[in-house]
Every structure is written in C-alpha cells, then in structure tokens.
Curated annotation (Swiss-Prot):
Belongs to the lentiviruses Tat family. This is Protein Tat. Disulfide bonds: none annotated. Isolates WMJ1, WMJ2, and WMJ3 were obtained from blood samples sequentially taken from a two-year old Haitian who was perinatally infected by her mother. One of its GO terms (cellular component) is extracellular region. Keywords: Acetylation, Activator, AIDS, Apoptosis, Host cytoplasm, Host nucleus, Host-virus interaction, Metal-binding, Methylation, Phosphoprotein, RNA-binding, Secreted, Transcription, Transcription regulation, Ubl conjugation, Zinc.
Length: 14
C-alpha cells in the first residue's frame, strides 16, 4: 500500500 510518502520509512512500502 502506498498510503505513506516514499520518504517515510515507517510506512508500508506496498
């Protein structure tokens, strides 16, 4: 899921 910004390592990467 790309709900988090690309630069945010705490977010999901799919």
């Amino acid at each position: 899921p790309t709900s988090q910004p690309r630069g945010d390592p705490t977010g999901p990467k799919e």
